[in-house]
Design a protein with these regions (language model features):
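Active-site rim/adjacent substrate-binding subdomains
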Residues: 1-139, 144-189
Length: 189
């Protein structure tokens, strides 16, 4: 089932997500729905808070970045209860987008290497180093677990310039090809 994505301004996006256990209700169905939602929305990552679930879960699929970024090929996995242990390497700029902030693309500086600890969808533990576009995608999705969104990474002046667009998104005044929940959309009577 394709899930609606919550838009900028929704309180779930600002909350720190909670860890889950293997007995989390309907986890397998949620993961399946998130994969379907990600494919439908043509994104490269989706965090549970973006589908209004304040839990520490995100999925990534780097394939849309291939062939421009060869290491994105076949990078498709789930991260549960992830803990970002270290960021290192060079700070690299990249124009990022976010399904919760449709049609906004902003340059974000991020380290090009990370070390992360997480559980896979079978709750098997992993600790890995990722770099390049893989590290970028993971950091973006991890931000959602910590209550951060794309606009939190832009310079204050740029964020001020974006305010009218962000307000419009929260009110549902944007063109988007996937279902969304708009926190400040006015209902017609």
């Amino acid at each position: 089932m394709i899930l609606p994505i919550v838009a900028y301004g929704h309180p779930t996006l600002k909350a720190i997500a909670q860890p889950i256990t293997p007995d989390y209700p309907e986890l397998e169905a949620l993961l399946q729905d998130m994969w379907e939602t990600l494919a439908h929305s043509e994104g490269v990552g989706l965090a549970a808070p973006q589908v209004n679930k304040s839990i520490r879960l995100f999925i990534v699929d780097g394939n849309p970045f291939y062939p421009d970024y060869p290491d994105a090929k076949d990078f498709k996995q789930a991260f549960i209860n992830a803990e970002l242990l270290e960021t290192f390497g060079e700070e690299v700029p990249f124009k990022e987008g976010c399904l919760s902030l449709p049609n906004i693309y902003e340059e974000v500086m991020r380290p090009d290497k990370i070390r992360i600890k997480y559980l896979d969808e079978h709750f098997q533990p992993h600790e890995e180093v990722f770099e390049g576009i893989r590290a970028r995608i993971i950091q973006h999705e991890y931000d959602h677990l910590e209550g951060h969104v794309l606009s939190d990474h832009v310079a204050p002046l740029r964020k001020t310039l974006l305010q009218s667009k962000l307000r419009a998104i929260s009110e549902g005044k944007c063109d988007v090809d996937y279902r969304m929940i708009f926190p400040h959309k006015k209902r017609h009577r």
